[in-house]
Amino acid sequence: MNPETLFPKKSIPENTTPELAAFNSPSYVNALATLDLASETYGDASLFNAAKAVRANRYLWQEYPELRGEYWQIGSSGQGDFWLLRRDGNICWYDHDLGEITPAAIVDFDITFDQFLALSVYLAQIERTLDTNEHYFAVPAHRQAFADTLNRIAQGLFARYPYRYFD
């Protein structure tokens, strides 16, 4: 499954905002320009299209100026948490339960945007499976396959992923 299965291609690529030039993620800039990212990827992530990302980041930087140029909000969980692109190209996550947003409250996922898309595609598949078989993770082999797949996307990702599908 590739990202185009979750996000349709735009008929005409868009120009992206100049603020993104400071962020080391050509794949995110390309996806923002060529894919319609304005949709829920899976239950815990909705990515923003270019217009929504600009609005979200203007607000973020107005409220938290220390984040300007260091973090770019790419999406949200719908629960008050959100996904960020850090200046070095890593994807990070902010948990609203931690209180006021500060750089110390932002968790580095240590994955690239391409890995985040791979994670999104896989989790969308898992959520479709769970829609038809809510006991899917009752099978130990399925739980292990889930953990193994996340760890193939990025070493140690299963342990870093904030939402639990089973415990």
Protein language model features and the residues they cover:
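Compact, glycine/acidic-enriched structural inserts
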Residues: 94-128
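Short, low-complexity segments with poor structural confidence in diverse proteins
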Residues: 139-141
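A surface-exposed partner-binding patch
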Residues: 1-87, 133-137, 147-167
